[in-house]
Amino acid sequence: MAHTELIIIDNYDSFTYNLVQLFSTFGIKIQVFRNDRIGIDDIPDNSYICISPGPKSPRDAGISKAVIERFYTKVPILGVCLGMQAINEVFGGKTQRAPIPVHGKRCTVTHNNESIFKGIPSPFKAARYHSLCCSPVACPLKVLATGPDGVVMAIRHPVYPLFGVQFHPESFLSEYGEVIIRNFLSYA
């Protein structure tokens, strides 16, 4: 890992500190900033970045979209739930109501065995807590995983280490969360 620090943009979500706990198992220094309490110039360009889950929609996620726009070509970024929706919107995709809201449910995720899913069986079980989803996914983003209802569960940029997951790898209901984070941290 060339990067030794992680910046988490907290979108006022109760799962943010579950992400902190999961990332901390890798010995990385972590700083958490609320989405309206940090300026874009305060974020170092040599850190990993995680855009946390949160209530509402990406338009209510403070600095999150600006952080993605500024840093996606420079550092690895992982967006979780709302963070994935923000990534999609940065590239022109839309966020809409999910066909059926899914809150606190363990569902199967089917993936293509690449990048952040290396070494993880497909399908696997993951926790979902969302009423919104990415539809459509913006070009050039690539769909990596889907749920049984067809909702996109993971995306990535084809060139840069920019990833989004709709599910919650940090939840105790999710399998392989630690592997997903390790795979993300392997991008330096």
Spell out what each predicted region is.
Residues 5, 46-118, 125, 181:
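Cysteine-nucleophile active-site neighborhood
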Residues 5-26:
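Short, charged N-terminal beta->alpha structural module
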Residues 15, 56-58, 172:
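Active-site beta-alpha loop architecture of Rossmann-like, nucleotide-cofactor-dependent enzymes
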Residues 29-35:
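Short hydrophobic/Thr-rich beta-strand motif most characteristic of the beta2 strand and flanking loop
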Residues 38-46:
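Short amphipathic alpha-helix with an adjacent loop that forms part of the alpha/beta core around
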Residues 115-159:
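Catalytic beta-strand/loop cores that center a nucleophilic Ser/Cys/Thr
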Residues 123, 164-175:
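Phosphate-binding/catalytic loops
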Residues 172-188:
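Acyltransferase
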